[in-house]
Amino acid sequence: MKYFLMGLKHFKNVAIACAPDNVGLAHELIGALRESDVMPFDFTLKALMVKSDGIHYSNDFSRVETIWLVIQPNSLAWPLFSEKLKKIIEKMLTGKEGLKWISCNICCGKETRTYYIPHFIEELDVLNKDKCFYSNNGGLIKPAYSSLKIQDYSIFPKPSMNNLWQITAAICISDKVKKEIVKSKISCINYESILIV
């Protein structure tokens, strides 16, 4: 049994979906989205450039390798999945994951694309708590997942404090899901093995 923490490979210059300035912090939005399946605002795509004097945003995408990615980086640090990636994951779901999708629009000039945010509505018990490492305040430092507890899930969030597990970039997927993603020729995703006991 293999599972992986999935994430986007590193890009030096990337397009980032920026939420409007007035939307607040990401963790404050999670509760407000509990009953929603559509984001109440649109994201705007900007080119992110890292220079010696800091990070810069612009509308000049000439140095960006690929503008539209299957997992679009964004100012909320949430997973924004393309429709292609969403469909792959959807067909692999067991129905026990407690997952729904929130659609969002990302605008770039005259083009708008719909992306999807995986929103976990049930906190899944996936850890072998005896094998995990915790900080003095109870925060999870190194998770150890229970093979018995995760065997019925194709995707699940890395547990975290408060409600941050509901919408998180720390998403684990089964080897079957990974193989389907690779088979579909999606190459910009990084896979990190997780500890299963």
PLM regions with names:
Residues 67-80, 162-169:
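Extended, non-catalytic structural segments that build the interaction scaffolds
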Residues 79-86, 169-175:
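Short coil/turn motifs at helix boundaries and re-entrant loops, enriched in small/polar
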Residues 44-74:
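A glycine-rich, hydrophobic loop/mini-helix early in the fold
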Residues 93-105, 187-195:
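Short, well-structured beta-strand/strand-turn elements
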Residues 75-76, 86, 97-106, 152-155, ...:
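Internal, well-folded beta-alpha domain core
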Residues 1-31:
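Short, extreme N-terminal leader segments that mark the start of a protein/domain
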Residues 84-94, 180-184:
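Short active-site loop/helix that positions an aromatic residue
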Residues 9, 110-197:
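Acidic, proline/glycine-rich low-complexity IDRs
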